[in-house]
UniProtKB/Swiss-Prot annotation:
Belongs to the glycosyltransferase 68 family. Its EC number is 2.4.1.221. One of its GO terms (biological process) is fucose metabolic process. One of its GO terms (cellular component) is endoplasmic reticulum. The lineage of its organism: Eukaryota, Sar, Alveolata, Apicomplexa, Aconoidasida. Coiled coil: none annotated. Pfam families: O-FucT. It comes from Plasmodium berghei (strain Anka). This is GDP-fucose protein O-fucosyltransferase 2. Pathway: Protein modification; protein glycosylation. Catalyzes the reaction that attaches fucose through an O-glycosidic linkage to a conserved serine or threonine residue in the consensus sequence C1-X-X-S/T-C2 of thrombospondin type I repeats (TSRs) where C1 and C2 are the first and second cysteines of the repeat, respectively. O-fucosylates sporozoite proteins CSP and TRAP. O-fucosylation regulates stability and intracellular trafficking of TRAP but not of CSP. Dispensable for parasite transmission to the mosquito vector and/or infection of the vertebrate host hepatocytes. PANTHER family: GDP-FUCOSE PROTEIN O-FUCOSYLTRANSFERASE 2 (PTHR13398:SF0). GDP-beta-L-fucose binds at G59, E60, G61, F62, N63, H283, L284, R285, R379, F380. The gene is POFUT2.
Length: 473
């Protein structure tokens, strides 16, 4: 009788596995697989789950948080590659407070309103914090953080140091001991003041360099030694940025694709308003950058003149601008460049998208232009160029930097660029209707100065996930 029951259970379980495998095969066939570590194991959903939560400094911008997601994805990918006993999930922190958003308070926005989550799930196991909270609450087994050893003997140290958690200072993390005799003794704020997370244990790890390999080793050891289910990594933006080839070799460099609806909105703008991809685009950042003297951003008036020069030089007829000072930029164009204002285009948020979604739409429009002009100090710019490299728009002449205003007499600023060119194009100057001649000699030289960044910082492969979305491809 027992054998009969056992056989029935075995047959039922086997049938369930076949059905679930078939369901997965049908749903995932719409997405190109890339030899994934966990999905290749047909029994992965039967493994015991482990969870890694993380966050960044309070208020950090959207694009930095995207970078950190790349770093943490690499940690998860490597954990699942090395450990066949458990399945490791990355818990995505909600969006509540960002210093760059005009509306700084939000109620736990999820990642799926910004990114295509199916693509990420195709490579690493993920779960939104709201779903984790339903299962386990606002708690975790360990709260840990990492910091850099800054003393002169740091590089001589053979092993990392393990310290009390409060030695990993994190601004506004509100670490406190909530009780002494309960399971979850400790509390920290989580993900832009979304909530507080309680933990059973806390630790700080320090080393002269904090790589994804160190994080991988530390969390794997904690999971096994303490037989725990979850770890929160506070301030995970201290983890070193991986090289693009590391991300490529681990199938991660192109998994952060924008939400499909936002891509379609951007493509509709390109097709209906710009008519084709034969336009230049630009990111002008002023709000906080004009206060940072080392960034040396040019005035809006000079920036607009330079954009016109670049447009004429490249034989284009449209300039799309993404900027945090939209009204002021439009005011300058209307006041000083009235005869050229028909060349300039700005995205209008007619569908009442969240401002973070608008930024993504504008990034996509910029990514698909024939030439992009950005700011080397801006992560917003960097992520546009990252997208451009993933859709074969990574050639040197296709990505230009606006240059700091003092580029021609500032050696420190010059060293930030791979190449600087001085191109006087007579026909382009003529098209500017003598406006060029009203500027000072310093301004004139700045206008014809073109700066180029380092391509080694970006991927070099066409993204299989983006191919079908490229307009006019």
């Amino acid at each position: 009788m027992k054998n009969m029951i056992y056989n029935l259970i075995s047959i039922s379980l086997y049938s369930l596995i076949i059905i679930l495998t078939d369901i997965y095969a049908k749903t995932s066939s719409l997405i190109c697989n890339k030899n994934d570590i966990y999905l290749n194991d047909k029994f992965y959903f039967l493994k015991k789950k482990k969870y890694i939560l993380y966050d960044v400094n309070i208020g950090e911008g959207f694009n930095l948080q995207k970078e950190v997601l790349y770093r943490m994805s690499l940690v998860i990918y490597q954990l699942n590659k090395r450990d066949k006993e458990y399945i490791y999930y990355l818990v995505l922190p909600p969006w509540c407070y960002l210093s760059h958003w005009s509306n700084k308070r939000h109620d736990n926005l999820q990642w799926n309103i910004f990114l295509n989550m199916n693509i990420i799930k195709n490579v690493i196991p993920i779960i939104e914090f709201s779903d984790y909270k339903k299962l386990y609450g606002d708690v975790t087994d360990f709260i840990i953080s990492f910091k850099y050893l800054l003393d002169s003997n740091a590089q001589k140290a053979k092993y990392y140091h393990v310290l009390p958690f409060d030695k990993c200072y994190i601004e506004d993390y509100k670490f406190k001991i909530v009780c002494k005799n309960c399971d979850y003794k400790y509390s920290v704020t989580y993900s832009g003041n979304c909530t507080n997370i309680k933990g059973k244990n806390t630790l700080c790890y320090s080393d002269y360099i904090v790589t994804n390999y160190l994080v991988n080793y530390v969390v794997h050891k904690l999971f096994y030694i303490h037989n725990i289910n979850s770890i929160l990594i506070k301030n995970s933006n201290v983890v070193l940025v991986p090289f693009p080839n590391e991300l490529f070799e681990n199938n991660i460099e192109d998994i952060l694709l924008f939400n499909e609806k936002l891509i379609y909105n951007g493509n509709n703008y390109i097709k209906e308003i710009l008519k084709n991809s034969n336009y230049i685009s630009c990111h002008l950042r002023y709000n906080d950058f004009k206060k940072i003297t080392s960034y040396d951003v040019p005035s809006v008036q000079i920036a607009i003149l330079k954009l016109l020069y670049i447009m004429f030089m490249n034989n284009k007829e449209k300039i799309f601008i993404s900027t945090d000072e939209k009204k002021y930029v439009q005011y300058i164009i209307n006041k000083h460049f009235k005869q050229f204002k028909h060349f300039f285009y700005f995205y209008e948020n007619k569908d009442n998208y969240h401002e973070g979604q608008v930024a993504i739409i504008e990034q996509w429009i910029c990514a698909n232009s024939s030439t992009f002009v950005g700011n080397i100090f801006s992560r917003f710019t960097m992520h546009i160029i990252w997208e451009r490299y993933l859709i074969t728009k990574g050639k040197e002449h296709q990505n230009i930097d606006l240059c700091g205003y003092s580029i021609n007499n500032n050696e420190q600023l010059k060293n930030r660029y791979k190449k600087i060119q001085y191109i006087y194009d007579h026909s382009s100057i003529e098209k500017l209707n003598n406006i060029y001649n009203t500027y000072s000699e310093i301004d004139k030289k700045y206008i014809i100065t073109l700066c180029f960044g380092f391509p080694s910082h970006f991927p070099s492969n066409l993204s299989i996930y983006r191919k079908k979305y490229i307009p006019f491809a």
